[in-house]
């Protein structure tokens, strides 16, 4: 089962709160994929609860992209309750000046031979701030559990900000956990090289950003990946002027 949603809103004079709750239950052998592209206006406070329960041999995937809103706080969760259950969170966040994208994931291993994967990429533009908050819990006495977490950040300006807050709790010795994080910048040399070949600065920045998130964008359905790339191009044009 795949469910897709797109979120957007016009700019109003007053602030707006969006507080949605999504709950998924994947029974034995079921597979659920939930795809979101969020592009709320900058005066929206986007505070969302997303959680899933995966039973034996079930799989839940959250594929999430946050571009809009002034403040986003969203941490999709999967409780791996059945043996050989699988959970995955794919997350893209883009924060421009005046935005704080506070996103992440939670994986709770509650059965043997469960597997979880978290891949998060964020882009900070201007004075934008992107934060990753992740939590991985493996219960006591479990065997054969595996988790992989990757969180990478790209800073596009001197005042851009990124934060990473991982929390990993392993209560036994029967699990494998690995965590990787990186922060990088778009080099002036690369921008200069592309501009010398007739590529405007905004287009050059868009190419760099799209290259950074390309592997995750491919996880989105075709119509959503095209829209996502276009939204990023618009953000880059607005930020560069």
What are these regions (language model features)?
Residues 187, 206-215:
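Small/polar glycine-rich anion-binding or flexible loop at a beta-alpha turn
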Residues 1-199, 217-241:
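Conserved beta-strand/loop scaffold segments within soluble protein domains that form the structured core
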Residues 203:
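Conserved tryptophan-centered aromatic signature that marks the ligand-binding surface of SH3
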């Amino acid at each position: 089962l795949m469910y897709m949603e797109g979120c957007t809103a016009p700019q109003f004079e007053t602030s707006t709160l969006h507080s949605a709750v999504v709950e998924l239950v994947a029974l034995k052998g079921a597979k659920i994929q939930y795809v979101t592209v969020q592009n709320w206006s900058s005066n929206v406070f986007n505070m969302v609860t997303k959680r899933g329960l995966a039973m034996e041999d079930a799989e839940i995937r959250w594929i999430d992209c946050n571009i809009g809103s002034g403040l986003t706080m969203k941490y999709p969760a999967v409780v791996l309750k059945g043996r050989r259950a699988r959970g995955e969170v794919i997350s893209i966040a883009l924060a421009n000046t005046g935005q704080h994208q506070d996103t992440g994931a939670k994986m709770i291993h509650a059965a043997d031979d469960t597997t979880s994967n978290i891949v998060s990429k964020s882009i900070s533009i201007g004075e934008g701030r992107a934060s990753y908050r992740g939590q991985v819990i493996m219960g006591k006495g479990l065997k054969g559990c595996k988790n992989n977490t990757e969180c990478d950040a790209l800073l596009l300006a001197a005042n851009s900000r990124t934060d990473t807050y991982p929390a990993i709790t392993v209560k036994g010795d029967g699990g494998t956990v690995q965590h990787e994080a990186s922060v990088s910048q778009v080099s002036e040399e690369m921008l200069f090289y592309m501009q010398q070949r007739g590529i405007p600065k905004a287009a050059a920045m868009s190419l760099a950003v799209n290259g950074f998130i390309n592997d995750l964008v491919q996880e989105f359905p075709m119509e959503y990946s095209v829209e996502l790339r276009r939204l990023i191009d618009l953000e880059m044009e607005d930020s560069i002027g």
